[in-house]
């Protein structure tokens, strides 16, 4: 994947170990990664980045600005931004309000690299605009 065609992911977590681990996994998946340790820092990183950011990965619970608050602010600036929340807490309200109503995604901690990759791939998958192809044989003849 060329540097220009790589999608950019912004990883935000106040815990350095989690942030570094998630960033390393996302880099291994072939994406360009930006990191921030807080919502305010993430807004600064976003504003200083010259190209669009395709995906925000953020912890739900954070000191200062929560993940959902950060997502709301970034979505005002870039409405097509995809959002993946990661959390180790029971997030019933978050799931209802953000994941279901706003079509964001949630990944519960602990998670594997495969779990993270599947969520990212699902969120960043290009919209499929192709015609349906039918595999029915022509003329109704069976081989045999």
Predicted features along the sequence, with ranges:
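Alpha4 helix (beta4-alpha4-beta5 surface) of REC/receiver domains from two-component response regulators
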Residues: 69, 73-76, 80-108, 114-121
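Acidic catalytic/metal-coordinating carboxylates
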Residues: 37-41, 66-70
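Charged docking surfaces used in two-component/phosphorelay signaling
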Residues: 20-28
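Short hydrophobic/Thr-rich beta-strand motif most characteristic of the beta2 strand and flanking loop
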Residues: 30-37, 45, 107
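The C-terminal output helix
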Residues: 121-136
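Receiver (REC) domain active-site loop signature in two-component systems and cognate sites
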Residues: 62
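Conserved sequence signature across two-component system core domains
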Residues: 12-13, 36, 56
């Amino acid at each position: 994947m060329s540097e220009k065609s790589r999608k950019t992911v912004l990883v935000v977590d106040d815990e350095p170990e989690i942030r570094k681990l998630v960033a390393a996994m996302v880099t291994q998946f072939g994406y360009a990664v930006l990191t921030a340790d807080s919502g305010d820092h993430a807004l600064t990183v976003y504003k200083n980045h010259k190209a669009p950011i395709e995906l925000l990965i953020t912890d739900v619970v954070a000191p200062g600005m929560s993940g959902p608050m950060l997502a709301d602010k970034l979505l005002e600036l870039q409405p097509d931004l995809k959002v993946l929340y990661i959390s180790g807490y029971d997030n019933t309200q978050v799931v209802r309000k953000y994941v279901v109503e706003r079509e964001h995604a949630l990944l519960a901690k602990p998670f594997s690299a495969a779990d993270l990759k599947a969520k990212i791939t699902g969120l960043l998958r290009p919209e499929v605009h192709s015609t349906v192809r039918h595999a029915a044989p022509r003329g109704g003849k069976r081989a045999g």
